[in-house]
UniProtKB/Swiss-Prot annotation:
GO cellular component, as recorded: cytoplasm; mitochondrion; PAM complex, Tim23 associated import motor
Similarity comment: Belongs to the heat shock protein 70 family.
Recorded superkingdom: Eukaryota
Targeting presequence: 1-43
Annotated protein name in UniProt: Iron-sulfur cluster biogenesis chaperone, mitochondrial
Subunit structure, as described in the record: Interacts with the Fe/S cluster transfer protein GRX5. Interacts with the Fe/S cluster assembly proteins ISU1 and JAC1. Component of the PAM complex.
GO terms, biological process: [2Fe-2S] cluster assembly; chaperone cofactor-dependent protein refolding; iron-sulfur cluster assembly; protein import into mitochondrial matrix; protein refolding
Reaction catalysis annotation: ATP + H2O = ADP + phosphate + H(+)
Cellular localization per UniProt: Mitochondrion matrix
The EC number(s) this enzyme carries: 3.6.4.10
Amino acid sequence: MISSRFTNVVRSGLRFQSKGASFKIGASLHGSRMTARWNSNASGNEKVKGPVIGIDLGTTTSCLAIMEGQTPKVIANAEGTRTTPSVVAFTKDGERLVGVSAKRQAVINPENTFFATKRLIGRRFKEPEVQRDIKEVPYKIVEHSNGDAWLEARGKTYSPSQIGGFILSKMRETASTYLGKDVKNAVVTVPAYFNDSQRQATKAAGAIAGLNVLRVVNEPTAAALAYGLDKKNDAIVAVFDLGGGTFDISILELNNGVFEVRSTNGDTHLGGEDFDVALVRHIVETFKKNEGLDLSKDRLAVQRIREAAEKAKCELSSLSKTDISLPFITADATGPKHINMEISRAQFEKLVDPLVRRTIDPCKRALKDANLQTSEINEVILVGGMTRMPRVVETVKSIFKREPAKSVNPDEAVAIGAAIQGGVLSGHVKDLVLLDVTPLSLGIETLGGVFTRLINRNTTIPTRKSQVFSTAADGQTAVEIRVFQGERELVRDNKLIGNFQLTGIAPAPKGQPQIEVSFDVDADGIINVSARDKATNKDSSITVAGSSGLTDSEIEAMVADAEKYRASDMARKEAIENGNRAESVCTDIESNLDIHKDKLDQQAVEDLRSKITDLRETVAKVNAGDEGITSEDMKKKIDEIQQLSLKVFESVYKNQNQGNESSGDNSAPEGDKK
């Protein structure tokens, strides 16, 4: 019989170090069957060769930075902005858009434009948070075969990790363009309160983008690095991070280059997106009350309202009121309908007051876990776009009894901190040590569905702990070890992050076999678990079944897909550049034709104009996404028209040269004139 329960026999006080095989409970990487792998925590003494970029993969926007010597620098994208919208879209022509271009077309393509997908990463489809999101977004969230929440656009499904991978690919391309060479190594940030599945899924996104993710750093910790890089004084700092989709509060102690996290807390489903949704609901309900029309099922209308709500939210951080004007939002038998309403800051603050209040308890818990009073906090750092909202700032002041610091950019601090950690790993930044913590308690299920903790939350990582358990039934030869993360006393209320079977236990009365379970948490916060039957002290047959995520083959397919897109993106870029060159050539030729039309053979002119028309039609096809026309085809057509134009204008050039020579022969130097 296989029991899903253990009896906890740690009463004896025994503590052992596991010598059995270590198995990564990496649900998000290994899907329905996870493979065994040895794991060791790197000491960090070996330095990485080549540049290491820091990426803040945000819910609404992402940011990229790198160390230039001892100074972190934010790298602007191709559009010239220092942050990139975390938006991915698929057009009817099969083109994939990322960033600014994807966000611009969202209002006309809402069903196939993905935003805020970070809120879904590493989550199960049936989780309450996912079910709430399904009602609020215009795109389809579907259940994958492994139970995860995936996305669907134009008949194809994508994992949230894959969408994150597309965004990371964009960031990698930006960095490679800036540095003039391919970039492989990166430090990527995650919300401090992300669980193991979400961290694994983020690393998978990096793999899909072709990146070697050297370290996963908690966002508040990264912001503290950005704040404290040049600070010499010891300090205890609170980082209040309210971004687009998540909220974190971390308390750190800065001491002579050592950044030690004392505690962390938060809410992985609280951020600017929720503030937008609150305002969208208000606008839709007000319109329904005034006009008798329900817009909630009209995806196009809701997307327009969402964009207007986001804009109004930002404006109300600096204005006391703003107008929302959306003409022709819908129509009925009486004609077109429009939205015209004024929103005041006070009105908006009342709408989102419950959301702002949700940040208070995590802050109190973080202070309690750190064993600190508010008076002992030396500085409060604000991170994330929502911390620009006056009501949020006032709430922070009321919690910590002090004015927040203004020295860091809320949108860029996390990426800068990631770049600093990259500098540490590459050896460019010295005398800096980062000690982070695990955000949630870790343990296993024991008899009666009890959650038995092995590692408590806010334990400094990397860490390792072992504990001895036994069987719950006589003659039991196998046990199922179920690993959970959370703070509740029963496993049913916590997050299952993995499970595996230990077989080959020698039959014995219940309570006699000694089964040692060891937990390892590495510097990324990734969890490894091993189990060993101490009585037999031999290799056991262990099958590990993951709770969710991507299989190795799925990741490999997505990496190949990303590479394919990367190649097509480069081909597309080259085609556009050749199209621009072709248009420039055509314009120059037409200009010369107009200037010299009286001196040219008319048949030759007609042939040349025909070639110009043909070339422009080809350019139009390329711009419309015709992949049948290669870059070489374009170059050949440009060369042909240039050669033809040279022949057409040859007589003009000859006449000009002859005229110049004759005028030169007829003119003598001033001194030679008689």
